[in-house]
C-alpha cells in the first residue's frame, strides 16, 4: 500500500470561492500558469482576441465571460499534485458551487481588497462551515487603491467569524504598490508587474532591517517597519491546528492580474492544506488509505463535448485506487459497472485516466443512470453523505411553444435537474411544470439548453411561489392526512420527492404550525 500512500500524501484538492468580479477566474488562470499547466493564461474580459479563459468553456460562458459550470484542473506544483475545482463565480450559480464545496478538502477565498467581504462570499462561507473546511485567503487587486489591510482583516473576522493570520503584508497600493513583506520568511518580495503569461523573476530582499531596503524603497522602508510592529501586536500568529479546524485563515496579499502573490498562496497550500481527508458515510467513516475503491458523484455536466451529446458525472475518489477497466458497484441501483473510459481534465481538455487516487476528480460517462450524490464502491453497501440539494429561491412556470413536445420537455427538465442545473417540480393537482433556481441566470441557461440539446422551445411565466420545502413525516397516517388537506400546495421534484410549494412565507409558517409532526426541510440529501 505504500505506493498508494505516497500518491495520497501528494494530493491537495481545493476550490476557489469569491464574490463575482473579485478576480476568481483570473486567479484560476494564474494558478494554472504558475503550475505550468497553461503557457498563456486567457485574460477574462479581453475577448476580442478570441482568447477565452481556459476554465470557461461552455458556449454561454464564452459569450458572457463568466464561469457557469464547475471545471476541474489537475497540475503538479512544488512536489504536490493539485486538483483545483473552479466553481461558478457568477452570483446566480450558487447551488452548483455549494455542492462542489463538498468534494474538496480546503478552499481559497478571494477578496477584492478595494471592496472587502461581499454577500456571496458570506453565503459560500456558510456552506464551508457545514464541514469546517480549512480556508486560505487572498486579498486581490493590490495594484489598485485598496482599503486599509488591518480593516480588511477585521472585517473578515467580524463577518465571517474566522480568525486571520497575515502571512504576507502589502507595501503601498495602487500605483505605489511596491510588493509584500513575507512575515514568516522575513523577506521583502518586490513587485514587478507580469501580465498575461509573463512571470517576472522575483526580486527578494532578505530581512526587514536590511539597509538594501532603504535604497530600494526610500521612505516606504521605515513605513513598512513601523507598520509591521503594529501588525505583530494586532494580529494572530499562524497556527496550523486552528487552520485545519477551519478556525483561522492564513492571509496573503497580491494581484492576480499582475501575476504577483499567486505562488505564495500555492506554497502555503502545499505546505499546510490537508491531504485527502476521511469521508462520512451512512455506515462509517471511510479513510483514504483503505485498499478498496470508493467515490461519490458531486456534479453532472451535459455536453462537455459539443461534438457528442454526452453527459459526464464528476466523481471525487475517496479511497483505494481507480484503474482503467475496473469494476465498480453503483450502490443506489445495486448494479456493477465496468469503467474503462474515465476521464481526467484540464479544463475542457479531457484525457483518459489510467489511474486515480483519493482526492482526484474523474469523469464517468453517464447515460442517464447516475445522479448527484450517488456512491460507487467495490461492493460495500455504503452511501456517502453530505451532498445537499438546497431549496430554490426563485420560481417560474415553464410552458411549451409547441404543446406536442411535452414528453421532450419533461425529459430535458428531469435530466437538467439531475445534473443540478435547475430543480423541477410537478404539482400534484395540476399539469403545470414549475422550475426552481437559486438565481435568474439559471432560468436563461435552462431555456437555452432545452433548445440546443433537446430541440424544445419553451417560455416562462410568473407564478406566485415564494419558497419550497421537502416534507417528511414518520407517521404514515399523518402524512396521508397532510397530503389530502394540502394537495394544492404539494408537488413532486425531479427525483419524485414530496415537496411543499409555498405561495408566501406566511402560508409556510402557518402550515408548519398546523402540522407539527411534518418536517419541512430547506435542504435534502441527494
Swiss-Prot record:
Coiled coil: none
Superkingdom of the source species: Bacteria
Membrane keyword on record: no
The species this protein was found in: Shewanella frigidimarina (strain NCIMB 400)
Ranges of residues in domain tr-type G: 9-277
Molecular function GO labels: GTP binding; GTPase activity; guanosine tetraphosphate binding; translation release factor activity, codon nonspecific; translation release factor activity, codon specific
UniProt binding sites for GTP: 18-25, 86-90, 140-143
Function: Increases the formation of ribosomal termination complexes and stimulates activities of RF-1 and RF-2. It binds guanine nucleotides and has strong preference for UGA stop codons. It may interact directly with the ribosome. The stimulation of RF-1 and RF-2 is significantly reduced by GTP and GDP, but not by GMP.
Keyword Cytoplasm: yes
Major location category of this protein: cytoplasm
Name of the protein described by the UniProt record: Peptide chain release factor 3
Record family assignment: Belongs to the TRAFAC class translation factor GTPase superfamily. Classic translation factor GTPase family. PrfC subfamily.
NCBIfam families: prfC, PRK00741.1, small_GTP
Location in the cell: Cytoplasm
